[in-house]
Amino acid sequence: MITIPMTENGPDMDMVEKYVENDSTVKGIWCVPKYSNPDGITYSDETVKRFAALKPAAKDFRIMWDNAYCIHEISDTPDVLLNIMDECKKTGNEDLPIMFCSTSKITFPGSGVAALAASENNLKVLREKYNYEIISYDKLNMLRHVRFFKNYDGVLKHMEKHKKILKPKFDIVLD
């Protein structure tokens, strides 16, 4: 495990590029690109573009794009994160990112509903690898989430409740 320092724009991309492009034993990087802990940094457009333009020494290198806080807004002017897949397609690197998110930090930790997105090549590999790992998904939990939220607007309305609780706490710490 290699620790990469954070800057105000995200990970130190000079260091990321040095390791990823010169060391074939580096197989991946884990990123929380929006409101990344501990400083709440959202990766800049330049950082996302540099990730998309990586030329990994390892052909099986992947960017694990954990967008855990994709809708966790506490201001009226939320950070905007560039779409990593769109940028990777522009550079011919659509197989680099494996993107995911979940409702774990929205509903119940460890009991949320997750989503995964990736290129068709990556999805094929993931389907083959994980097809036999589980008998079935927790369909009752999925149903609970659908009935509770109803639709995307329902998720956003729920996040407004989170904002009302969390914003005053952030204001105290940040002021």
Regions from the PLM with identified roles:
Residues 1-175:
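PLP-dependent class I/II
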